[in-house]
Swiss-Prot record:
GO terms for molecular function: 2,3,4,5-tetrahydropyridine-2,6-dicarboxylate N-succinyltransferase activity. The lineage of its organism: Bacteria, Pseudomonadati, Pseudomonadota, Alphaproteobacteria, Hyphomicrobiales. It comes from the Bacteria. PANTHER family: 2,3,4,5-TETRAHYDROPYRIDINE-2,6-DICARBOXYLATE N-ACETYLTRANSFERASE, ACETYLTRANSFERASE. This is 2,3,4,5-tetrahydropyridine-2,6-dicarboxylate N-succinyltransferase. Keywords: Acyltransferase, Amino-acid biosynthesis, Cytoplasm, Diaminopimelate biosynthesis, Lysine biosynthesis, Repeat, Transferase. It comes from Rhizobium rhizogenes (strain K84 / ATCC BAA-868) (Agrobacterium radiobacter). It is found in: Cytoplasm. Substrate binds at residues 111, 148. Its EC number is 2.3.1.117. Pathway: Amino-acid biosynthesis; L-lysine biosynthesis via DAP pathway; LL-2,6-diaminopimelate from (S)-tetrahydrodipicolinate (succinylase route): step 1/3. InterPro entries: DapD_Trfase_Hexpep_rpt_fam (IPR005664), Hexapep (IPR001451), Hexapep_transf_CS (IPR018357), THP_succinylTrfase_dom1 (IPR023180), THP_succinylTrfase_N_sf (IPR037133), Trans_hexapeptide_repeat (IPR050179), Trimer_LpxA-like_sf (IPR011004).
Amino acid sequence: MSATDLASLENAIEAAFENRDNVNVSTRGEVRDAVETALNLLDSGKVRVAERGSDGNWTVNQWLKKAVLLSFRLNDMQIVDGGPGGSTWWDKVPSKFEGWGENRFREAGFRAVPNAVVRRSAYIAPNAILMPSFVNLGAYVGEGTMVDTWATVGSCAQIGKHVHLSGGVGIGGVLEPMQAGPTIIEDNCFIGARSEVVEGCIIREGSVLGMGVFIGKSTKIVDRATGEITYGEVPPYSVVVAGALPNGNTMANGQPAPSLYCAVIVKRVDEKTRSKTGINELLRD
């Protein structure tokens, strides 16, 4: 699609979103066509909700988020086949894999093991591996990335190349509660088991989060080497573990106030870290 066509599509989505109270399951014509086109572009990876520039800054394509939201007003509830034991689900969003056969899977080039759930408009790049996991609509999963068992990739989240999302990891979405920007995990990151990254936070390239690290916009991220406290973004090649900051205050009963949770940057990634968190290429052959 040309830049001119994309601009026209964006304008159509923006206009429909401004008039969203009048958009419903009976809506036909330009609005429905524009939303369907936007979702198909997301599904194929030809467009993304957010894109990283050469300067490292991310640009959010808000109009694509709006297209995802409009789809909920346009689509009625329907039976979704494929449940265990021949059961069905009841939803507005079909499976990405609906109607796929062997040729389509081979063309897509990723692995999806039984009980991997991907909603339509999410993109999965070649050589990615989906264990029994959940990838929500509008998300982007990069080449060679592993989404391990019971990990969840939230709506419109951006996962880079050669990332490992360990078992039970949660990557937050943007649709509810509504966030300005998607949660982003850049290339070559390792996210430890049961960790959560939410609220549009960014984990920069090559970083490693230990098991059970929780990062939201209000989470203090403490650099142990400098004492600097930041929010919302982990610097490149950081090794981060769960920690606690002393409160320093005294409660009314005279006892020390409880320490508060924080994420601690304990060091930068080194060869020892890489040897423990490296991607196993044998799994991607």
